[in-house]
């Protein structure tokens, strides 16, 4: 395997792992938020605020993975 093949595989692995984990986290956050709102509808604004913040933090991991993959690919 030459260096370009290794870079390609490293880029693919980084993107795969870096997007699967946040997707699972966002799904779990959404399901738990829906459960919480279903049990206590009056707390919906607080739950939604916390949910959006948690989703933003989870999505940041995917953005970091994208940046790392681009560095691997082009540097």
Please name every model-derived segment:
Residues 1-75:
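Hydrophobic alpha-helical transmembrane segments of small proteolipidic membrane proteins, enriched
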């Amino acid at each position: 395997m030459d260096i370009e093949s290794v870079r390609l595989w490293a880029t693919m692995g980084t993107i795969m792992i870096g997007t699967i984990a946040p997707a699972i986290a966002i799904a779990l956050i959404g399901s738990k938020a829906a459960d919480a709102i279903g049990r206590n509808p009056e707390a919906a604004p607080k739950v939604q605020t916390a949910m959006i913040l948690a989703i933003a933090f989870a999505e940041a991991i995917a953005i970091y993975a994208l940046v790392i993959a681009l560095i691997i690919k082009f540097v």
